[in-house]
C-alpha cells in the first residue's frame, strides 16, 4: 500500500524488547538507545566478536520465553496464547550482509524473519555509512526482492546470506525526495512555516536542564541559592540559546531554469538545481535519471549538458557529488553529525503519529531579529514534496479508513499490522484535516454553497468535507441554536472515538476531527460515499434513525445487528420512538444517531452526540432556563461507573442469596445422620472448594442499559409504553443522582484525604473530572463542596474558581473573535486580556487598531473595542453563573493569580505569547514595564531629568514612549494562534491487553512473567503509536517504575528520562505530566547515586510548578521533603533544614498545626535541626511532634513512642551540650588575658564536645542519671539558660532513622 512508503519509526521495536531481556547485557545501555535507529545496528553488527554469544543468548532467551508462554497456556487462555504466537514469530533474529556499490562496500544488518524488506531498506537508509542511498532496490541470488514481502518469504534467505543493493534510475518524484532528504541531512532545510504547528512545536528542555547539572559547581548544588518564595521566572520554559550548527553548504535550491523543457525531459532530465558551497562557488546541477552532474548553465545562459572542465563531476547521490565539489563539505558534515549526536535523539526525532505540542510562551521575535533567514527553497518545498499539482498528497481518506477496518484481525500479527496502520492513518488524517480547517477559518477555501449564510456554508478541501460547528440550517433551534450545535459536534467526536474503540465488525465511521481556531469551531469529515446523493422521491436521505430532526424516523433491517452490538457495549437500551404522526419505531440507539447505507455497500453510523442520556436533574434545577443549550448529557465514564456500581450491588445480593441457601442446606444436613469415612471427608472438602469457586457470580443475568431519548420530547402512546418510559426515566434519574450524591462527593473526599493526586492546572483538573465521569458544568458544585471543607481544600477551590473564570473568558473571547478580520485578532485578544488582567495597570484600556487598515474591512466586527474592564467582569460573572451555577465573590478580580490565569487562557485559545515580564499590577510597573523606554533608573531621578531636558518639543515623544507600559499586553505580544484539535483516534487494544496482562501477573506475584508481558506491551506501543506519543510516554513512566521497584535503577533512570522528553514534546514543557515526570526522574537519579543531578531536576520541577500553579501546592510538600532528604545525603544540613521548614509551613497552612501530617514533618525537621547543630531547636520541634502524636494517636501508638524516645535522647544531648558550654564559658571568664574574639569561634569547641561524649563515661553516666530524674520541662528550662552552641556525638546514627516517619504520613505525602 502506498501509505507504507512513509518513513518508518526506528527499527523493529519487538527486537528491542527482546534484547532488553539479554542477561549478558547492561539493560540500561540498551534502554538508552531504544529509539536510536542506528544503535541496534551498531550493537549487533559492528562488534563482530560479540555477535555469536549474542545469538546464543538470544536462543537461551527464546527457550526461556517459550517456557513462560507454556505456563501462560496452562493458567490462562485467549490473549496469552495469542501472545505466545507473537513471541515465537518475532523471535527469529539473524544477521545478513548487504553488498554496496560504493564505500564501505559491505555492511552487516541484524534482521527479523517477520520484517518486511522495506524495513531493511529503511535501516540501510538511516545508517551513517549509507546515508547517500535513497533510490535503490535489493537483490538476492540475482533476483529483485519485492519491498512488501516478509524476509521469511524470500526463498533461501538465512543467516549470513548476502543481499545486493542496486542503484535504480531516478524518477522525478524520487529525485525530489532525494533533494528533500539531502537538505535535511546536511542541515540546510531551515525552519518551515506551518499553519498547524506553532513556534517551537515539539520543544524539549531536557537536554538544557541536564546540561545545567553537568556544569554545576562541584562544591555547590542547584538548590544552594534557590528561593522557594521567589516569583516564577518565565525563562524556565523557554528554549536555551544554542550555538549555531556547522554549515555544510551555503544554499541548495531549485534553479531558475527548472523545470526542464520538453525535449530534454525526453533525454532524462528531471530537475535543475543550484548549489552554493561554503567556499562561495556556485554550481548548476542537473538531476538526471542516472544521477546528478554539474552542468554548463550560468545565471544567464542555459546549457544543461555535463561540464567537462576542469573535470567531469557526477554521482548517483547528491551527497557524494557535493563532497567532490566542496573541499570543506566532509569535515563540516562530520562536525554536524557530532553536534547532533550530543543531543538526545528523542529531542530531535520527527513526529510520526501525533501532533506536537505548541508552547503557550515563546521567545519574542524582537529578541532575535535575524531568526528569519532568506531561503528560496522554503517556498519550493511544497513542490518538492507534493509535485506540481499537489496530486501526490491527495488521498481517498474514507476508502483508506474503511479498507483498514476490513483488514484481517484473526492473529496477533494481523492485529499488530492493522493497528499500526490505523494509528498512522488517523495521525495523517488529523494533521491534514486540521490544516484544511485553518484555511477554512481564514476564508481561503471557496464554499460549495456560496449563496448560503456563512454558518451554513460547506467546503471540500484535500478530499475532506468541512462545515462550521454552528446551527446554520436551524437543526438545533429547540436545543439552543449555535451553542447546542457547537457542543453537539464536540460530543460527536467523543462518540465516534468510543465506537472506533469498540471496533465492531461491519460498522463504519467517517474520519472526524473538530478544530477550534480564531473563535470558530470547524468539523472535518471524510466524505462518505452517497452522503450527497439525491434519493428518489419517497426515499429518505438517512436509512436508520431520525431523518429530519425527530419528525421522520427511518428503520432498516441491515442496521439492527451492528447497532445492537454498539448499543450493548455503550449501555444503550433498545427503546421505541415515535414520529410526528405517532407511529412507533423500535431503535437500537438514540433517535439522533443515524445510519447511512453508503454507495460502497458499507453501513455508516453518523451523529453520535447522543450515545448517553441527558442529565435530567441538571436541566430541571433552578437556573436551567438560562443555560445556553439542552445538550447537557452524561459522560460515558459516568455511565460505565454507574453500571459497575449496579453490578456490584447485583453480585453482593447474589452472593448473599447463595450463602443463605447454603446455610439452610447445611442446617438440613445436620439433622440427617452423616457418615464419617475418609472418603466422605474428602468429598466434603471438595464441595467446600467448589463452594468457594461458586462465589464467582455469573453476571450474564445482570442487565442494565439506559434510554438516551428520555426527557427529550418523545410521547409514548399506550399505557404500557408510558409505564416503560417512566421506568426508563427513573433509571436515568438514578444515574444522574449517582453522579451528584456519590461520584462528586467521593472525589472531594479523596482529594481531602490525599488519596488522589492533586490537580495543578485547568488541564489536569479537567482530566481528573472526566476520568471520574464528571462534566465540566459541575465546576460550580465542586467549588461549593470544596469551600465547605475549609483550608484543607483551599487550593482546590482556588483552582476551580480560576478554571471557571478562564472558561467563561474563553466563551466571551470566542464570541468576539468569530467575526474579527484576521489582521485584528491580536488587537482583540490583547484588549480583552487587558480588561481582565491589566485593569490595575490601566483601568480604561483602549484597543490598539490601525485605522487605515480598518477601513478596508467595512463588514468586520469591531465590537470588542467597546469592552471595558467593568463590562467584561460583568460578562464573566454572568457566564460563570449561567454555565456553572456559581456566584463569584464581589471582588474576585482583585485576587486573581494573573500569570496562571493567563497561561490557562492562552492554552484554551491556542495563543502563543512572546515571553517577557508582564506587569499586571501597579507594583510591578516600576520594576518591569518601563524597561521599554530605556530609562529604568530610580524614580527620584525622574524629576531631575525632566528639568534638564524640559522643553515642550520633547514631551510628545516622551508620552509616546511611555504609552506602551500603560497596558499589560500589547498586540505584538500575541505572536501566533494555533488550532486546537479534537480527534477520534482509537487507542491500541492489543498494546493495552498486553499491559493489563502484565499488571495482573505482577499482582499475582509472577514477577518474571509480568515483566515479559509489559516489555511486549512496550514494543507494541512503540510499533503502533511510534516513539513520540502520549501513550508511549505513559508506558515509559510505568516501566521505569517497574524497573525501579525491581532494583534495576539504571534502566529506570533511562526510561524515566525518555518519559520526560516524550511528555515534554507531546503534552508541553510545562504540563502537569511533565512536572511529575521530572520528579520521578529525580527520585531515580538520587537512588542511582546522582543526587546533584536529581536536585537539578527538582529545581526545574519547582520552577515549573510556580508557573502553572504558584506556590504552596499540596503535592509540593512531598517534593520539598524529598529535596530535604537529598540535601541531607549531600551533608548540606543547613539547606536541608530550610526545605523541611518550607514543607512544614505549607503543611500547617493546609492541614493545620495539630495534624498528623504536621507532626510527621516536625519529626523530620527536628532530626534536620539536630544535624545542623541546633539542639535546642531540635528538642522544641520534637516535643511539638510528640505532643501532636500523643493527642491524635494516643500514648501507645508506635509514632508516639518513637517520638518520645527521640525527644529524650535529644533533650539529654542538649543538656550535656548546654552544661559543657557553661563550663567553657566559666573557664574563659577566669582567663582574663584571653582574646575575647576567639571565644566566639565554635569550630574548636565542637570536636571537644564530640570527644567527651564517649570518653567520660563514668561522669557522663552520673550526669545522665541525674538528668533522667528530672522532667523534660525542667531539662528544657536548663537548656534555655545555656549557650546556643550545640553538637552531638551520635549524629551519624541518625541517618538510618531519618525516614521511618514517612510510614505515618500517608496522607501528607499524597
UniProtKB/Swiss-Prot annotation:
It comes from the Eukaryota. GO terms for molecular function: mRNA binding. GO terms for biological process: intracellular distribution of mitochondria; mitochondrion organization. Pfam families: CLU, CLU_N, eIF3_p135, TPR_10, TPR_12. Residues 662-682 have a biased composition (Basic and acidic residues). Keywords: Cytoplasm, Repeat, TPR repeat. One of its GO terms (cellular component) is cytoplasm. Residues 375-619 form the Clu domain. mRNA-binding protein involved in proper cytoplasmic distribution of mitochondria. May associate with the eukaryotic translation initiation factor 3 (eIF-3) complex. This is Clustered mitochondria protein homolog.
Amino acid at each position: 500500500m502506498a501509505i507504507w512508503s512513509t518513513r518508518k519509526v526506528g527499527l523493529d521495536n519487538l527486537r528491542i524488547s527482546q534484547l532488553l531481556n539479554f542477561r549478558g547485557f547492561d539493560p540500561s545501555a540498551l534502554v538508552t538507545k531504544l529509539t536510536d535507529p542506528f544503535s541496534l545496528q551498531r550493537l549487533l553488527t559492528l562488534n563482530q566478536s560479540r555477535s555469536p554469544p549474542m545469538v546464543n543468548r538470544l536462543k537461551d532467551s527464546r527457550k526461556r520465553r517459550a517456557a513462560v508462554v507454556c505456563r501462560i497456556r496452562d493458567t490462562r487462555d485467549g490473549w496469552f496464547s495469542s501472545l505466545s504466537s507473537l513471541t515465537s514469530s518475532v523471535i527469529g533474529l539473524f544477521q545478513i550482509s548487504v553488498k554496496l556499490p560504493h564505500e564501505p562496500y559491505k555492511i552487516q544488518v541484524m534482521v527479523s524473519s517477520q520484517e518486511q524488506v522495506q524495513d531493511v531498506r529503511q535501516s540501510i537508509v538511516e545508517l551513517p555509512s549509507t546515508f547517500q542511498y535513497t533510490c535503490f532496490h535489493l537483490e538476492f541470488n540475482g533476483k529483485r526482492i519485492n519491498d512488501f514481502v516478509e524476509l521469511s518469504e524470500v526463498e533461501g534467505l538465512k543467516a549470513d546470506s548476502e543481499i545486493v543493493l542496486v542503484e535504480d534510475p531516478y524518477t522525478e518524484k524520487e529525485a525530489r525526495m532525494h533533494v528533500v532528504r539531502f537538505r535535511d541531512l546536511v542541515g540546510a532545510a531551515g525552519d518551515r512555516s506551518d499553519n498547524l504547528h506553532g513556534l517551537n512545536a515539539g520543544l524539549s528542555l531536557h537536554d538544557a536542564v541536564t546540561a545545567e547539572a553537568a556544569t554545576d559547581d562541584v562544591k555547590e548544588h542547584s538548590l544552594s541559592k534557590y528561593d522557594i518564595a521567589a516569583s516564577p521566572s518565565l525563562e524556565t520554559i523557554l528554549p536555551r540559546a544554542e550555538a549555531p550548527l556547522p554549515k555544510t553548504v551555503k544554499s541548495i535550491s531549485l534553479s531558475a531554469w527548472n523545470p526542464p523543457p520538453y525535449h530534454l525531459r525526453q533525454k532524462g532530465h528531471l530537475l535543475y538545481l543550484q548549489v552554493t558551497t561554503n567556499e562561495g562557488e556556485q554550481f548548476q546541477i542537473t538531476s538526471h535519471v542516472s544521477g546528478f552532474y554539474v552542468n554548463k548553465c550560468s545565471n544567464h545562459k542555459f546549457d544543461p549538458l555535463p561540464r567537462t572542465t576542469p573535470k567531469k563531476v557526477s554521482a548517483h547521490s547528491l551527497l557524494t557529488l557535493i563532497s567532490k565539489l566542496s573541499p570543506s563539505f566532509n569535515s563540516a558534515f562530520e562536525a554536524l553529525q557530532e553536534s547532533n549526536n550530543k543531543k538526545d535523539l528523542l529531542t530531535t526525532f520527527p513526529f510520526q503519529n501525533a501532533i506536537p505540542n505548541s508552547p503557550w510562551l515563546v521567545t519574542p521575535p524582537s529578541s532575535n531579529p535575524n531568526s528569519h533567514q532568506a531561503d528560496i527553497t522554503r517556498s519550493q518545498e511544497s513542490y518538492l514534496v507534493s509535485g506540481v499539482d499537489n496530486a501526490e498528497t491527495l488521498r481517498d481518506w474514507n476508502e483508506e479508513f474503511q479498507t483498514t477496518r476490513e483488514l484481517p484481525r484473526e492473529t496477533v500479527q494481523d492485529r499488530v499490522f492493522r493497528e499500526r496502520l490505523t494509528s498512522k492513518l488517523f495521525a495523517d488524517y488529523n494533521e491534514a484535516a486540521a490544516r484544511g480547517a485553518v484555511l477554512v477559518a481564514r476564508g481561503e477555501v471557496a464554499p460549495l454553497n456560496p449563496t448560503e449564510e456563512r454558518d451554513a456554508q460547506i467546503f471540500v478541501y484535500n478530499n475532506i468535507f468541512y462545515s462550521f460547528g454552528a446551527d446554520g440550517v436551524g437543526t438545533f433551534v429547540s436545543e439552543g441554536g449555535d451553542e447546542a450545535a457547537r457542543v453537539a459536534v464536540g460530543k460527536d467526536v467523543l462518540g465516534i472515538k468510543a465506537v472506533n474503540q469498540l471496533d465492531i465488525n461491519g460498522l463504519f465511521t467517517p474520519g472526524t476531527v473538530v478544530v477550534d481556531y480564531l473563535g470558530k469551531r470547524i468539523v472535518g469529515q471524510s466524505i462518505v460515499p452517497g452522503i450527497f446523493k439525491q434519493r428518489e422521491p419517497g426515499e429518505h436521505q438517512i436509512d436508520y434513525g431520525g431523518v429530519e430532526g425527530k419528525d421522520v424516523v427511518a428503520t432498516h433491517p441491515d442496521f439492527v445487528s451492528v447497532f445492537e452490538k454498539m448499543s450493548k457495549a455503550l449501555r444503550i437500551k433498545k427503546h421505541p420512538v415515535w414520529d410526528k404522526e405517532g407511529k412507533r419505531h423500535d431503535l437500537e440507539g438514540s433517535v439522533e444517531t443515524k445510519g447511512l447505507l453508503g454507495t460502497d455497500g458499507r453501513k455508516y453510523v453518523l451523529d453520535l452526540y447522543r450515545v448517553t442520556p441527558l442529565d435530567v436533574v441538571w436541566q430541571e434545577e433552578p437556573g436551567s432556563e438560562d443555560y445556553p443549550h439542552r445538550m447537557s448529557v452524561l459522560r460515558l465514564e459516568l455511565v460505565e461507573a454507574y453500571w459497575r456500581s449496579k453490578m456490584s450491588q447485583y453480585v453482593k445480593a447474589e452472593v448473599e442469596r447463595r450463602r443463605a441457601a447454603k446455610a439452610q442446606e447445611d442446617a438440613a444436613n445436620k439433622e440427617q445422620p452423616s457418615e464419617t469415612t475418609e472418603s466422605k471427608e474428602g468429598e466434603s472438602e471438595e464441595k467446600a472448594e467448589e463452594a468457594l469457586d461458586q462465589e464467582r457470580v455469573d453476571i450474564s443475568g445482570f442487565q442494565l442499559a439506559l434510554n438516551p431519548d428520555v426527557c427529550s420530547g418523545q410521547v409514548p402512546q399506550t399505557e404500557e409504553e408510558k409505564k416503560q418510559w417512566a421506568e426508563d426515566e427513573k433509571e436515568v434519574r438514578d444515574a444522574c443522582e449517582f453522579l451528584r450524591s456519590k461520584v462528586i462527593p467521593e472525589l472531594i473526599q479523596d482529594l481531602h484525604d490525599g488519596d488522589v493526586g492533586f490537580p495543578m492546572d485547568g488541564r489536569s483538573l479537567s482530566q481528573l473530572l472526566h476520568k471520574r465521569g464528571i462534566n465540566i458544568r459541575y465546576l460550580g458544585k465542586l467549588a461549593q463542596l470544596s469551600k465547605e471543607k475549609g483550608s484543607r481544600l483551599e487550593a482546590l477551590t482556588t483552582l476551580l474558581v480560576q478554571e471557571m473564570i478562564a472558561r467563561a473568558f474563553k466563551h466571551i473571547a470566542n464570541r468576539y473573535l468569530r467575526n474579527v478580520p484576521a489582521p485584528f485578532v491580536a488587537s482583540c485578544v490583547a484588549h480583552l486580556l487587558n480588561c481582565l488582567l491589566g485593569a490595575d495597570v490601566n483601568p480604561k484600556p483602549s484597543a490598539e487598531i490601525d485605522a487605515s487598515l480598518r477601513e478596508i474591512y467595512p463588514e468586520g466586527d469591531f465590537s470588542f473595542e467597546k469592552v471595558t474592564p467593568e463590562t467584561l467582569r460583568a460578562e464573566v460573572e454572568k457566564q460563570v453563573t449561567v454555565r456553572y451555577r456559581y456566584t463569584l465573590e464581589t471582588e474576585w478580580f482583585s485576587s486573581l493569580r494573573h500569570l496562571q490565569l493567563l497561561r490557562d487562557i492562552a492554552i484554551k485559545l491556542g495563543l502563543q505569547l512572546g515571553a517577557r515580564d508582564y506587569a499586571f499590577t501597579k507594583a510591578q510597573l516600576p520594576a518591569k514595564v518601563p524597561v521599554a523606554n530605556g530609562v529604568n533608573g530610580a524614580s527620584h531621578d525622574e524629576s531631575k531629568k525632566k528639568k534638564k531636558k524640559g522643553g515642550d518639543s520633547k514631551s510628545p515623544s516622551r508620552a509616546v514612549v511611555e504609552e506602551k507600559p500603560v497596558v499589560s499586553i500589547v498586540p505584538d505580544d500575541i505572536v501566533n494562534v494555533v488550532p486546537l484539535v479534537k480527534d477520534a483516534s482509537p487507542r491500541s487494544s492489543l498494546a493495552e491487553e498486553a499491559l493489563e496482562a502484565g499488571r495482573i501477573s505482577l499482582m499475582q506475584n509472577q514477577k518474571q512473567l509480568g515483566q515479559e508481558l509489559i516489555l511486549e506491551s512496550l514494543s507494541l506501543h512503540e510499533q503502533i503509536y511510534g516513539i513520540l506519543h502520549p501513550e508511549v510516554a505513559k508506558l515509559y513512566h510505568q516501566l521505569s517504575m517497574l524497573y525501579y521497584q525491581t532494583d534495576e535503577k539504571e534502566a529506570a533512570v533511562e526510561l524515566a528520562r525518555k518519559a520526560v522528553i516524550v511528555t515534554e514534546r507531546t503534552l508541553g514543557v510545562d504540563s502537569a505530566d511533565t512536572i511529575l515526570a521530572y520528579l520521578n526522574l529525580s527520585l531515580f537519579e538520587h537512588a542511582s547515586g546522582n543526587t546533584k543531578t536529581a536536585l537539578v531536576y527538582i529545581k526545574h520541577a519547582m520552577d515549573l510548578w510556580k508557573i502553572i500553579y504558584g506556590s504552596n501546592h499540596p503535592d509540593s510538600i512531598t517534593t520539598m521533603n524529598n529535596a530535604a532528604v537529598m540535601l541531607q545525603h549531600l551533608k548540606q544540613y543547613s539547606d536541608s533544614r530550610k526545605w523541611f521548614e518550607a514543607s512544614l509551613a505549607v503543611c500547617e497552612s493546609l492541614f493545620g498545626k495539630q495534624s498528623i501530617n504536621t507532626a510527621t514533618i516536625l519529626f523530620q525537621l527536628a532530626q534536620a535541626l539536630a544535624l545542623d547543630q541546633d539542639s535546642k531547636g531540635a528538642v522544641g520541634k520534637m516535643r511539638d511532634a510528640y505532643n501532636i502524636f500523643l493527642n491524635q494517636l494516643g500514648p501507645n501508638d508506635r509514632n508516639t513512642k518513637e517520638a518520645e524516645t527521640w525527644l529524650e535522647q535529644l533533650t539529654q544531648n542538649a543538656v550535656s551540650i548546654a552544661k559543657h558550654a557553661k563550663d567553657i564559658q566559666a573557664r574563659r571568664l577566669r582567663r582574663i588575658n584571653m582574646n575575647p574574639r576567639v571565644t566566639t569561634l565554635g569550630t574548636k569547641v565542637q570536636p571537644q564536645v564530640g570527644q567527651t561524649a564517649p570518653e567520660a563515661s563514668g561522669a557522663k553516666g552520673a550526669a545522665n542519671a541525674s538528668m533522667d530524674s528530672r522532667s523534660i520541662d525542667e531539662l528544657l528550662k536548663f537548656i534555655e539558660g545555656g549557650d546556643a552552641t550545640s553538637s552531638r556525638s551520635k549524629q551519624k546514627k541518625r541517618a538510618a532513622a531519618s525516614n521511618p516517619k514517612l510510614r505515618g504520613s500517608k496522607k501528607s505525602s499524597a
